[in-house]
Amino acid sequence: MGDWSFLGRLLENAQEHSTVIGKVWLTVLFIFRILVLGAAAEEVWGDEQSDFTCNTQQPGCENVCYDRAFPISHIRFWALQIIFVSTPTLIYLGHVLHIVRMEEKKKEREEELLRRDNPQHGRGREPMRTGSPRDPPLRDDRGKVRIAGALLRTYVFNIIFKTLFEVGFIAGQYFLYGFQLQPLYRCDRWPCPNTVDCFISRPTEKTIFVIFMLAVACASLVLNMLEIYHLGWKKLKQGVTNHFNPDASEVRHKPLDPLSEAANSGPPSVSIGLPPYYTHPACPTVQGKATGFPGAPLLPADFTVVTLNDAQGRGHPVKHCNGHHLTTEQNWASLGAEPQTPASKPSSAASSPHGRKGLTDSSGSSLEESALVVTPEGEQALATTVEMHSPPLVLLDPERSSKSSSGRARPGDLAI
């Protein structure tokens, strides 16, 4: 047999542009077919015709019997099988080299156009792009040719034809020789005078090689089927992804803007949801009446009027405003009727129709709290009037103040 090194180099170049399963298939082809065929099988079948003997002296009978027993030698049959199975891969390799060469020529033309341009017109000019902006790049991140588009179709046809050739050669080997060689072969072909017995050399060893090459062919067939399934499943997932997200491929192949990358590199903003805050509008009528009540005395700076809503009140906010308005009017009326003397405060607090209770703290300021007020709408409101006075003056002489505060007459007192 001839030298397989040239075919091996070509297939090695094709291995760089194949899938993982395709690389395994090429490894099986190299080791278990080409090497075994060149190293061992040729030695076994080297003496095939010379050792094929028949029990006849008729000239030409032995040759015609050998031709019927072996229409084609096993060695040549397997060599043809390797060549036919490798041909689709070589066609795919030619397509890859053609694409790479076209890409190189396109880059050379772009560089030549840039060199021909004048410096005024050529500065800052980008290389011309002849392809569509949506076309995927020729090479992937690792610098290998991307299997996509027309190249992917060529690769699929490559696998399909390899599978068909494998099936055809397995079937041909079965119909030509079977899977086992018998040591005795009977031949009755002309010009043999009668049925003659012919004997095959090394039948057992040849049978082992036949079974081995058949097993390798079946393994290659299984690898082809797995590769078709792998590519089909990958293409199906890609189609489903593009169907549900048609802009994914555009975003994947679209170059990113450096400014957008810098803007997006910061920490993501986090929005915290807060519970809704409801505010009840202030009643304008109450505020106006409180400040401009007719006949109301001027309030000191330390006087504060606070109106509290009852937590159990229900109804429309307008009703609350009406209740607050009536309560404020009653407070101002009672405040105007009371004399502005400290002595009358306890009596006025005790005789208040609303049951006010006077509270005095340690600092001397008085606190007055009113009871619940029932509005005409049947609602309850709590009005609290707070009077805050400045603390009493501190006496400079405690003894003098105690003497003057005593009510009994002393001998040293002057009579006026």
Swiss-Prot record:
Q: Which regions are flagged for Basic and acidic residues bias?
A: 110-128
Membrane topology annotation: Multi-pass membrane protein
Q: Where is this region: Disordered?
A: 110-141, 336-416
Report, per the Swiss-Prot or TrEMBL entry, which residue stretches are intramembrane. 2-15
- The signal sequence is none
InterPro entries annotated for this entry?
Connexin, Connexin46, Connexin_C, Connexin_CCC, Connexin_CS, Connexin_N, Connexin_N_sf
Gene Ontology terms: biological process: cell-cell signaling; gap junction-mediated intercellular transport; response to hydrogen peroxide; response to pH; visual perception
Q: Where does this protein have coiled-coil stretches? A: none
PROSITE patterns from the UniProt entry: CONNEXINS_1, CONNEXINS_2
Tissues and organs where the protein is expressed, per its UniProt entry: Detected in eye lens (at protein level). Most abundant in lens, but also present in heart and kidney.
Lineage top rank: taxon: Eukaryota
Q: Bias regions of kind Low complexity — which residues?
A: 342-353
UniProt entry keywords in alphabetical sequence: Cell junction, Cell membrane, Disulfide bond, Gap junction, Membrane, Transmembrane, Transmembrane helix
- Report the GO molecular function annotations: gap junction channel activity; gap junction hemi-channel activity; identical protein binding
Spell out the disulfide connections.
Answer: 54-198, 61-192, 65-187
Pfam families, alphabetized: Connexin
> What transmembrane ranges does the database entry give?
20-40, 72-92, 159-179, 208-228
Q: Which residues lie on this side of the membrane: Extracellular?
A: 41-71, 180-207
Q: Where in the cell is it found?
A: Cell membrane; Cell junction, Gap junction
An example of a Gene Ontology cellular component annotation for this protein is: plasma membrane
- Could you give the subunit structure recorded for this chain? A hemichannel or connexon is composed of a hexamer of connexins. A functional gap junction is formed by the apposition of two hemichannels. Forms heteromeric channels with GJA8.
Q: Which PANTHER family does the record cross-reference, listed alphabetically?
A: CONNEXIN, GAP JUNCTION ALPHA-3 PROTEIN
- Protein family per UniProt: Belongs to the connexin family. Alpha-type (group II) subfamily.
The protein in question is named: Gap junction alpha-3 protein
Source gene? Gja3
